[in-house]
């Protein structure tokens, strides 16, 4: 399979690239590879989905017709091998392996969460929260749960904490840095946001980390903070 433009990923960066290409080039072939289905949803809106404020359609950047309208060959699969000399990418798509030959390549897969090394975490029923699948898995796992600890006070952690309070959960947000959103806000702005989040019902612990997790009474787990 050959294509002029190959894009690995199919979210915000990929969509912007497709629109930019089509604004100056209506004819060249474009192929996008998405590991997730549906393709092209907004990760920052996952907390809104979890809280029940929107459905899956409400978090999509573009509708399904976008790909057809821009004549993009959309492949659902996982890119697992890149040969920069031969300009090829191998993609696992279902039971098939595709080799795609490209002229130009854009990798727009976004980030992956870094799971901290915490004693006992592997048996603690932990959840990541960066994909639609994560949100669906967490939603199922919240059934019958009253208390939730969120590790990380970045955009994902803050948004998730607020969504969880809307679901009636008691939430503790734990951030290693002296204030939340440390890469975005200064201490003063962060303090103002912290007060707003606390009023929403989130307990915030900054300058702290989770040392270990162990089983409490019944099915619950206890996080030891230091």
Regions found by a protein language model. Name each.
Residues 1-6, 63-149, 222-226:
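FAD-binding core/adjacent interface of flavoenzyme oxidoreductases
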């Amino acid at each position: 399979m050959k294509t002029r433009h190959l894009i690995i990923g199919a979210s915000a960066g990929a969509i912007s690239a497709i629109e930019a290409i089509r604004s100056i080039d209506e004819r060249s072939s474009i192929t996008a590879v998405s590991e997730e289905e549906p393709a092209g949803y907004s990760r920052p809106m996952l907390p809104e989905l979890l809280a029940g404020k929107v459905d899956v359609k409400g978090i999509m950047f573009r509708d399904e017709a976008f790909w057809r309208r821009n004549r993009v060959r959309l492949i659902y699969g996982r890119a697992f091998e890149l040969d920069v000399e031969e300009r090829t990418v191998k993609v696992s798509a279902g039971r098939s392996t595709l080799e795609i030959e490209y002229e130009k390549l854009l990798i727009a897969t976004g980030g992956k969460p870094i799971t901290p090394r915490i004693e006992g975490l592997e048996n603690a029923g932990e959840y990541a929260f960066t994909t639609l699948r994560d949100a669906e898995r967490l939603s199922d796992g919240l059934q019958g749960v009253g208390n939730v600890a969120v590790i990380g006070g970045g955009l994902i952690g803050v948004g998730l904490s607020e969504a969880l309070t809307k679901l009636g959960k008691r939430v503790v947000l734990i951030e290693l840095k002296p204030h939340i959103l440390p890469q975005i806000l200064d201490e003063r702005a962060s303090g103002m946001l912290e007060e707003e989040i606390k009023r929403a019902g989130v307990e915030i612990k900054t300058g702290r980390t989770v040392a270990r997790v162990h089983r409490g009474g019944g099915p619950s787990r206890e996080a030891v903070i230091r």
